[in-house]
Amino acid sequence: MGARENVTRLLWTRSGARRIPPTRALDAALGRLAKGELFRICEFDPRGPLYLLPTRELVRALAARIRACGARRILEVAAGDGFLSAALRPALRGTRIVASDSGAWADPRARMTAGERREFRGVSVPGVRLGGCVLRFDALAAIRRMRPELVLVSWLPPGRLLERLIGAPVLYVLEIGAKGGVTPGAWSWRFAHEFCEEVERNARCRLDERPRLELHSRVTLYYGARHPEHARERVRPGDWLWQFRPRVTAGRSSVRPQR
């Protein structure tokens, strides 16, 4: 069996349903891929796209963190196919877990920059297909409708949506992101938060070509507007966080479809 086939068999069944592999097996398989091959699998395989690659250990660690918050009503926003919520339900019995997504990324061009649209013109790139149990609402509308205690979100694009979620009437926002500016960055740390290292250790994503050498996921628990410790730090020039403030880049729009 080739290295690529070994990875895809860990991620999907023969019928195309997604799998939850053990972390050790996935790490070993990823380590045998050629450089750049993981991105091609996650981006171009017609069963994708994939961003977060949930493992059994991640699901257990994430469920334990949510359970420690005492949250019983959980909403995953920008949920795509809803796979993460579906994986968590058996581990969080007695809680209500709902997944929602606006459907904005069903058209693959909606999740690309202008440069990516030029680069991949003529290339078959899958859009994000909503799962059968995923409600079609944008994130803030879903919060108004579902009134969750905890909002779960994975791989939001850079922008202000994460801040809007933190400012919504919820107790917690649990964000699974990635280093390197591909998801909201350290500027969001102005808001009161906790880092979830125990979850990060078990998180794998499309950037983890060599997970035994370097991991890229970042998992942060923010206190939402309903939490008694909700707060936002005022950041001034010279403060450490000031370097992460948003900057306007000429020639490239920072606007992404809301999910």
Question: What kind of feature is each model-predicted range?
Answer:
Residues 71-80:
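Conserved class I S-adenosyl-L-methionine
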Residues 1-67, 107-146, 150:
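S-adenosyl-L-methionine
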Residues 149-160:
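A short SAM/SAH-binding and catalytic strip from SAM-dependent methyltransferases
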Residues 96-101:
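Conserved SAM-binding motif I beta-strand of class I
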Residues 158-245:
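C-terminal substrate-binding/active-site "lid" region of AdoMet-derived donor-dependent transferases
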